[in-house]
């Protein structure tokens, strides 16, 4: 079963959509972005989230202490670090989470912006629960809706669980599942219309992933 994460949740309407179609994860972006939410907003939205949907906090080069503070305030299930975080940074973050009551059991996801095969070797250095592969775009920490070579994700699976992000949409959701069978897929702009989450696209995206999984059985 391919897991699905809908990232960039910021409105009560978005929560209503995901409660209806039940992705496995949703993402709250705390980094600078047009989808950015405050800790107060995320906490309020999470209170309305259906049981069983896990929350991922997305951070870029944030102070470790601030991340732990937001984890405590919002009761996040996972932390996705999407910047230039070092191996030492990740180890420090894990240690601080484990020493804090609200942080125990919180997963750490390390995002890597993939340019070529040489970037995959970086994964061996990190102790992460999940690796999220995104497209490399100069000057941007997100993939900006760009697709990378999915074959690289197959190589990354040697180092752990892999989520594929970057340019996923209704047009290619099933293709990525059938071609490399990743642990999970992450979508944001691919299920939006006019900069806002689109109920039809969310439903269709999840349906396409489910159908692709069935065809691969």
Question: For the regions a protein language model found, what residue spans apply to each?
Answer:
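Conserved N-terminal beta1-alpha1 strand-loop-helix module at the mouth
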Residues: 1-98, 104-217
